[in-house]
A protein has these predicted regions:
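Adenosine-phosphate binding glycine-rich loop
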Residues: 79-118, 205-247
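Glycine-rich adenosine-cofactor-binding loop
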Residues: 1-18, 117-138
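A short, well-structured beta->alpha microelement
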Residues: 14-29, 52-53, 163-170
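Residues at the starts of beta-strands that form the adenosine-phosphate
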Residues: 21, 26-27, 62, 120, ...
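Phosphate/diphosphate ligand-binding glycine-rich loop within oxidoreductases
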Residues: 40-101
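Residues in the short beta-alpha loop(s) of Rossmann-like NAD(P)-binding domains
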Residues: 8, 69, 149-151, 203-205
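NAD(P)-binding Rossmann-fold cofactor-contacting core
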Residues: 7, 140-160
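Rossmann-like adenosine-cofactor binding region
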Residues: 35-39, 49-62, 157-224
Length: 247
């Protein structure tokens, strides 16, 4: 049995994928949204309290979510269930980052009037998403400037011929045509962003208070839901397989 608290094509694709894998017929799988909650109490886009999920743990049950609290995970385990927090699954995070970067490139190619080689893109953050996005943009011929607080990263980028600047309030953005934020925390204040600069924010939360930006949180679920669902399904499959090997 598979019960999903997320609706839409991503969840449908995940369920379809899991329906094809070899697993114990008695195994129950509970899929919680990605991310699972915003307020720490209710499941995202529902009126269901997250602790109500505990009532579904009957026999061998796997609960899969994203950003789950320690207390919730402990409660699941105390009832005999198993917990997969996708936030701790590096393979999932990498695959999701690749999809996010690919979606972002798709947005740029379909909403700008210039070829990549004629655009200078500022990428804020050089984590999983920022790194893959930078590589894709460079491959397409775009000019890229990476904004990151890590001095070692800036040194490495410089050795590869990639422009970079320290992420701070007085960073120079005068030569940037487009700014893409991948960092989870606010770095630039609205007054430091050049007037008229297009800003795309891939992170959740309000990172550019007072500034109009294009928000694309969880963009794979919107643009590539079938692939996003398979990434989700593969994570659950790995978890189940690992549990079987360790049993």
């Amino acid at each position: 049995m598979i019960h999903s608290y997320e609706n839409g094509k991503r969840a449908e694709s995940c369920i379809e994928y899991l329906g094809r894998i070899e697993r114990d017929d008695t195994l129950r799988i509970v899929l919680l949204p990605i991310p699972t909650t915003r307020d720490g109490k209710t499941i995202l886009n529902t009126k269901v309290y997250i602790n109500e999920v505990l009532d579904e743990i009957i026999g061998d049950t796997v609960v899969c979510g994203y950003g789950l609290t320690d207390s919730f995970c402990e409660a699941v385990r105390s009832r005999g269930g198993r917990v997969l927090d996708l936030l701790n699954d590096e393979d999932f995070l990498i695959e999701n980052a690749e999809l996010t970067a690919l979606c972002t490139v798709g947005i740029l190619l379909t909403t700008t009037e210039y070829a990549p080689k004629d655009v200078t893109v500022g990428v804020v953050g050089y984590g999983r998403i920022g790194k893959r996005l930078t590589n894709m943009l460079l491959y397409l011929g775009a000019n890229v400037r990476v904004y990151t607080t890590r001095e070692s990263t800036r040194t490495d980028l410089g050795e590869c011929g990639v422009a970079s600047s320290k992420s701070c309030c007085d960073a120079d953005m005068s030569d940037i045509d487009l700014l893409i934020n991948t960092a989870p925390a606010a770095i630039f204040s609205a007054e430091k962003i050049p007037h008229g600069l297009r800003v795309i924010d891939l992170a959740s939360g309000e990172n550019f208070a007072g500034l109009t930006v294009e928000k694309y949180p969880s963009v794979p679920a919107k643009m590539l839901p079938k692939s996003a669902g398979r990434v989700w399904g593969r994570a659950v499959e790995r978890f189940i397989s690992a549990a079987c090997r360790n049993a």
